[in-house]
Amino acid sequence: MKIYTVENLPGVNYEVLGTVTGSTVQSKNFISDFGQSLKNIVGGELRAYTQMMENARRLSTERMMAQAQALGADAVIGVRYSTSAIMAQAAEVLVYGTAIRYK
C-alpha cells in the first residue's frame, strides 16, 4: 500500500473511503532516561529518544495502514504526522490521512 502526503492525485480516478488514523504513546525506561538526561547537560543528539520517536512513527504508520487495508484501500493520501508530549518523558505520535480505492 502506498502513502502520499499530497491532498489529491491529479489524473487518477479514485473513491474516497474515509479518514484513517494510527497512534501510539511511547516512553523511555528509567535507566535510558537517566543516561539521556546526562547527555542533555553537555548537548548533542539524544539517540535513545530519536530511536524511540522513529519506532513510534513506524508503529503509528503500520496501525494507520492496517485500518486502511481493513477498508479495502489501495492507498492513503493527505498523510500528516503530529507529535505531542503526553507527560514528562512520554510522547504521542499520531498519523492520519484519507483512505482511497482506485476505480
What residue ranges belong to the model's regions?
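N-terminal presequence-like segments and the immediate start of the first folded domain
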Residues: 1-32, 91-103
